[in-house]
Amino acid sequence: MTTLEAIKFDRTNVTLQILDQLLIPYSTEYLNIEGVDDAYDAIKSMQVRGAPAIAIVGSFAIVVEIKNRHISSIDELAAKIDYLESSRPTAVNLSNACNEIRALLGNSESLDEVYKRVFDFAVALYDDDLSNNHKIGSNGVDYLVESLRSQNFEGPFSIITYCNTGSLATSGHGTALGIVRSAYKALSKENSKEKFWLEQIYPCETRPYNQGAKLTTFELKYEKIPFTLICDNMVTSLISRTHNKKQVKDIVAPVKFAIVGADRIVQNGDTANKIGTFQLAAIFDSFNRRNTGPRDSLKMIVAAPRTTIDLKTTTGDDIIIEERPANELTTLKGPILRKDVAGEKQIVGVATPGIQVWNPAFDVTPHELIDSIVTEEKVYAKDKEGNYHL
């Protein structure tokens, strides 16, 4: 499969482009990132998003900043790094990358001295992320197979996804969606060597920014992985119908897993991710509490690289949650469609004007509601006391 390329960094000419994700799925256009200011704007406006991707873009932007000589001293560079880090505070990957670049500055007195160090760091960050995503995919598939075998499950099954965690959120392949990609390759009806097969993906729309509807469906369609889009508030009905062997759009494949990404995982396993993830986990927990046997059990899986794990923070109570502008909830922006042809972009209202709005970008799912955390190193499960050891 050929995956989408959200980040283009020319290592010879030292230029950076990103795919403008605000225009997807109706057009694919790349933006030039000339330095830190451009990267800050792109990250803040969510033209690029996803914890691994914003760390990579931020790091490459610092390289381009030095190369283009937008700054004249180490002190100016340090100030630019501080500014960049403030663009999205919840995602730990960007903060970690900025801290590592600060350490590379050391006692250097010239920009020429630090340029190669930062260049090498940014390139390694990109390459490692891509390699690690494939490992996450492989580890995730092993976990799916082990779980279904332990239940003596047979026949088709389906997976729920949330937000966007694929090539558009990383250097490529993806984290949670990377597991889906790897799973479909290994466990589609045509390829599966097991008594079960992956029949369908259900991406949640993911309000209010609709990354699931716009981005995840774009990736799944691009790679010809079968899917059916659902609204966030359809999850309970979907699980109930599929487990009662009722058709959903002519498909009978019980939901067995939700696979989500993470913007920050803290020491005890509490996980910050796109708003609504906690709700999804609570729904899974509710169904598991009332299921009639192990064959009916659902698994809530978090997929993320080790760089997303923040061992300095003890619990999710200490995670700073970014709040987004009210208009992202009260309006929608998109092109006017005429016979599926995209025309001029318009902003339309979907709520009463002048109202109070609360619009947090993330929530924190308690570790008690997470069945496993899949990384490039291993799959973490809780011990007998219900604790993670990350």
From Swiss-Prot:
It is found in: Cytoplasm; Nucleus. It catalyses: 5-(methylsulfanyl)-alpha-D-ribose 1-phosphate = 5-(methylsulfanyl)-D-ribulose 1-phosphate. Keywords: Amino-acid biosynthesis, Cytoplasm, Isomerase, Methionine biosynthesis, Nucleus. The active site is at D263 (proton donor). GO terms for biological process: L-methionine salvage from methylthioadenosine. One of its GO terms (cellular component) is cytoplasm. Pathway: Amino-acid biosynthesis; L-methionine biosynthesis via salvage pathway; L-methionine from S-methyl-5-thio-alpha-D-ribose 1-phosphate: step 1/6. Its main location: cytoplasm. NCBIfam families: eIF-2B_rel, PRK05720.1, salvage_mtnA. Catalyzes the interconversion of methylthioribose-1-phosphate (MTR-1-P) into methylthioribulose-1-phosphate (MTRu-1-P). HAMAP family: Salvage_MtnA. Belongs to the eIF-2B alpha/beta/delta subunits family. MtnA subfamily. This is Methylthioribose-1-phosphate isomerase. It comes from Meyerozyma guilliermondii (strain ATCC 6260 / CBS 566 / DSM 6381 / JCM 1539 / NBRC 10279 / NRRL Y-324). The lineage of its organism: Eukaryota, Fungi, Dikarya, Ascomycota, Saccharomycotina.
